[in-house]
Amino acid sequence: MGLDKACGVRNNARVANSSSTKLLPHTVVALVKDRPGVLQRVATCCGEKGFNIRSLAVGSSEQAGMSRMTFVVDASTDAEVMVAELKKLEDVSEISDISSQEFVSRELALVRVQGGKEARKRLLDIVDIFHAKIVDVAPDSMIIEVTGHENTIDSLVRLLKDYDVVELVRTGRVSMLRGA
């Protein structure tokens, strides 16, 4: 089915982020065909329906020729509308909103921080507290890697703001249902 039929047209889209609607993060996991244009079609469909993608991670899956996609959208209780529309795309094999179920969720961040010897000692203490790793050291900077729940990464980043954060990159959430 074409994108226009699956997602409608922009001026007919129902906007989920109207001021009268309380938005909640919804974690959606999909198994999609691993071919060019799939990510664009999924993102366009979400946008056409008025859903903002806050986080997105896509990578290889356990099935050859398929990718696993995890994305977080801001939505009210009508996230099922978006999931139903995405199911209509021929590239989407499986999709579900797992927000109401028990799931494991992780994110990775790399943070480049500048600092001399004195700052490094304090930074190493912070790295240890968060079970993070130093993955690169240069004369005036280091790169810290942290993996964990979104809140853990947010907390580490807040603490590092007291230092000279030169660069920050985050992967976005990856998630799996518990015990499935």
Regions inferred by a protein language model and the residue ranges of each:
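Long, contiguous binding/interaction regions
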Residues: 2-68, 72-180
